[in-house]
Amino acid sequence: MYCPKKGSFIMKKHAISLRSSTVILMRGLPGSGKSTWLRNNNCEDYVISPDTFQLMLSPPIETTRDGEFTYEINQNVSRRAWELTHECLRSRLSCKVGNAVGATFIDATFMSDRAVRDIKRIVLEETQGRAIVVILDFTYLPIEEVKRRNKMRRGTYRYVPECVIDHMVELGAQMDVNSYGVRVLDPREVQITV
């Protein structure tokens, strides 16, 4: 990254190659900047997103929350969206046609133990240890900032009720991300390479 004030390049502490056999879990609350980080780092072609599958399976649903009309992602298709996420991950990890290689980013909150363990299990089953799992942890962002950003989404299907965010915070606080045996990185210290 170029630093104009100093006229030099700043080296990030960690590099992730888009050609590596790496599965990167984008962990963080809704509105913490996961999708923006992926877009800003030109990683969108390497992303699997359960939210995208939910929108493919069902249009947003109309609802009234706190007396206000709004749209939400249909949570009734969440299970199927995660099944498709797992199927796509298995396909990417097992694809040998044309000597395919490449990183895979999974854009979800990963604020539950099960979601992380499921992905880790799939990676191990499909690659027998040839691929690694990394967590890019966006939980450094203060909850007040997450809620401020979320309020800016009000009226769109990307808005998440604050009670849901609070519940995710509680779930995430129970997790010890260092117990999964994977690298946990601060996204501000990661550089993407080709």
Predicted features along the sequence, with ranges:
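ATP-dependent NMP and nucleoside kinases share a basic, alpha-helical "lid"
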Residues: 56-61, 65, 110-158
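Short catalytic-loop micro-motif centered on adjacent basic/acidic residues
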Residues: 103-107
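Structural signal for conserved beta-strand scaffold positions within catalytic alpha/beta enzyme cores
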Residues: 49, 135-137, 184-186
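ATP-binding Walker
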Residues: 32
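Conserved substrate/cofactor phosphate-moiety recognition/catalytic segment
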Residues: 36-102, 145-147
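Short amphipathic alpha-helical segments and helix-helix/interface helices
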Residues: 38-39, 89-90, 120, 124, ...
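Conserved GTP-binding G-domain of TRAFAC-class P-loop NTPases and closely related GTPase folds
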Residues: 7-10, 14-15, 20-23, 27, ...
